[in-house]
From Swiss-Prot:
The gene is rps6e. It comes from the Archaea. Belongs to the eukaryotic ribosomal protein eS6 family. GO terms for cellular component: ribonucleoprotein complex; ribosome. NCBIfam families: PRK04290.1-3. This is Small ribosomal subunit protein eS6. It comes from Archaeoglobus fulgidus (strain ATCC 49558 / DSM 4304 / JCM 9628 / NBRC 100126 / VC-16).
Length: 129
């Protein structure tokens, strides 16, 4: 099992991708949107902390923070995650995924809440070379 973790850095406005496999991927299962995880899960130094902000499953359905569990549901949405109405009052039934990470999730979006000593730019430059 593997997850693609997108790490957004609010200081620089850049985002970095990291594939997480094996034991570290298993540590992510059961976490929810809003949980803070250690940077060691995605091979960052231990002084980094990441907050889970969302994600998508293998079919492209977005995770919605107000939907409990791991199941996929078809909800009548008037806005927010999964639907952007073109005009006021528009509602539509859309498929979304619950807020808990399961084996069906493919991409996990995170944001850095605690920065470490080494900037992310240097960490990801070293790994690209």
């Amino acid at each position: 099992m593997e997850f693609r973790v997108v790490i957004s850095d609010p200081k620089t406005g850049r985002a970095y991708q990291k594939v997480v496999e094996g034991a570290n991927a298993n540590r992510l299962i059961g976490k929810q949107i809003g949980d803070v995880i250690s940077g060691t899960i995605v091979d960052l130094p231990p002084d980094y902390e990441l907050k889970i902000t969302g994600g998508t499953d293998r079919d492209g359905f977005p995770m919605r923070p107000d939907l409990p569990g791991t199941a996929r549901r078809r909800l009548l949405l008037s806005g927010g995650v999964g639907f952007r109405p073109k005009e006021k009052g528009l509602r539509k039934r859309k498929g979304v995924r619950g807020r808990v990470i399961s084996k069906d999730i493919l991409q996990i979006n995170t944001v850095v809440v605690k920065h470490g000593k080494v900037p992310l730019e240097e960490i990801f430059k070293q790994k690209e070379e």
